[in-house]
Amino acid sequence: MEHQDSSPPRFRNSGSNRVTVYNGTTLPTMPKSATPTSSSTTVTTHLQNIKEEETNDDELTQVDRSSPRVLGRISSTSSSSSNIDLRDNLDMLHEIEKSNTNISLSAPNLHEELGVLSDKGNSKEELALLPPLPHTGEMEITPQFDINEAIFERDDISHSSRLEPDDVLTKLANSTRDATGEDQGFVVMTHGHDASTNDDSQLSATILDNQTSFDLSKALEMTSHSNISNIINSSGSEGRRSRTPVSNSTLKPNLSSPESAEREANTTSSSSTSDHGATMQYDPKKIITPIPVLPSSVREQQQNNAPLRERSRSNSSALASTLRDTIISGLPQNINSVERKLSRKSNRSRKNTVTFEDRLQKLPPLSTQISNQYAKVAPAENNIALHFHNLPTPVSNTQTPVTFQSESGLTGGEKKMPFLRRASSALLRKTSAKNCSNLTRTNTPTLSTSSTFESDLNARQPMLIRRSSTIDNKLPRRQLSCSKLYSRLNSDSKFANSSRASEEVLVSTPNDTEHVYRKTSLGSKIKRGFTRILSDSNNSKEILTLSPKSMVTTGPTELSFSSLSTVGGHPTTPVSKENDRVSIDGVSTFNRASTSLPESSTDDISPLREEGKINVPKRTSSRKILSKNSSKKNVLPEQQTKPSEIYLDKEALQSFVPVLSVTEGTHRINRSSLQTQSTIGLCITNLRNKEGMKLNAKEYVEILAQQQRKEDERYAVLERKFASCRWCSDKDLQYLKKKRISMNKIWSDYVRFYRGKLNNP
């Protein structure tokens, strides 16, 4: 080892300071002001045990756990260099031990503390700091501190005295220079004189000297907590501040006087509030001359407290003033004033509240004297029909409007009023719906007979509303929709002439006719629907049985069509003279249906050429044509030939084997047609080209049924073989099943068509 030397160390005295010179390196010694002599024998015995175990492999570990002489905080970034320095320090301790040096230690509990901390490895908390030593006047052993408390004590001690030997911590200082405020380690080297040169009396006299430049007793005098917070802020140790919370038990030193205790308590509360933003419990005894704040209402009180809440959020140091203002604003006298105002407001609103039942009972009768008042309200509304029994009740000038009332000023009975009001209004709606016509007609005269009302309406209402209002007053509710429809048609110039006659008929109804409004039930609606369907079917049968000549002689029944001229069995554009709109709609229906009409339908339309005008009902004719279109929509064009001309090549049909595409999907765009993959394609080709033998419908239907069964059996065999061989995928099997279903459907439709021809030749 580098520092091993057989020569004893040299000592040099300079005044009251003790300095140890070892191989040209000056090492300061710890004064005995904070080290009790009672533990010297224990440490000497411990060091002798270390010397006996020097030959073992675990020598360095045992010395590291037992010896408290070297305490250093080693940074994680310089773990390799710190191991070398630690080994050099241990070698130095062995050399000092050979010179039979008496070492005085602090509390004996320190050995256990350092032994636990040294087991943690080369991390930041590997070597803990020296716990605070007792006061010079008190020789009591201080209790053990936790790691966080030792870190704060380390900061204060390192500020007052820094004992860094040049040869021990050179690499540590170079590697951790940027983090000296947070991770700076210091080594306390305690050293005493040899028993032969200096006795205990001289050593104690030297250590207890208060005029020394380095005094550990000053390190025990804790500074104020504001200085500690300044040290933390200056070093920039944000991570340490997050893991070491400030508490009164941690930072509270040994106090000597009650004045200092009070000062320390005040500084502790202020520093904890400013640094950590903790919520402080406000002491109401410290409020001096509170200023009474009397806001006029709860809203003003909330407005006064709003800026205080914002100020407390933005600045945590003003928390005490905010709490004081909120406590003052919440005094009992303020609460009493707010309650009086709320109760006064609730009493005022309770007097002015008009319930729905009171307004309904106080409804004034509608007479001719107040008709002008309602006439002035009518133009402001955009309603076409004027329902006078639904107009609001006029409010007199003596009544005050209902004021808004908060829930805090309401009693339990008033809070239930909306529910009772809804229930009562539902019952009143039921009764008013039954007695509405009786109330309006027995209590009030007819409004249309009032000359003043008519004159005022003529002066203020437009023509459309005036015409519809005169109609609505004389019609039951069932006819109101009709009158509104006519009034809308009157606004259009196209329908003005057509609707004027019907309007005159409606206006000419007598005023004294009593119309009774009856509520239609579900059974009556169903009966009316059935009668309407039956009447439509009877009318269509009668029209179909009538000949064209008889239809002309019967005259116009409903709306009339113009004449239809057909060319080659297809209707062309008609010559319209009257009712252009209705006739064009009818012809468009004929044109849409004429594309699918067969050639045989020309015989039915041929009598129309001879007649000038044929009046056919629109609804029945459209239904007839649509029924024909729906029956022939799914019919193939080859099936529209005459049933007597059926051709089929039986030999080709028996020898033909269709090609099936198994792996082709049924919904692909470019897929081959299913008719080409079946024998039905051959049948269609024979019909189109008239190839083969001429057959009647009965024989043809039998042949088609046989082919359908054969083809279905063929698909079944293919499906069974593919499933047993297992070379076909599941998707292909699904395609095959879908094709089988589709082909059966095509064959069924084809056979059904010719079977219908057979039944109806």
From Swiss-Prot:
Positions of post-translational N-acetylmethionine modification: M1
Q: Which regions are flagged for Low complexity bias?
A: 28-45
Describe the PTM.
Answer: Phosphorylated by CDC28.
Q: Which domain of life is it from?
A: Eukaryota
Could you tell me where the Polar residues compositional bias lies? 13-27, 244-259, 266-276, 590-604, 627-640
Q: Which UniProt keywords apply?
A: Acetylation, Phosphoprotein
Chain segments carrying region Disordered: 1-82, 229-320, 590-640
The protein depicted here goes by the name Uncharacterized protein YOL036W
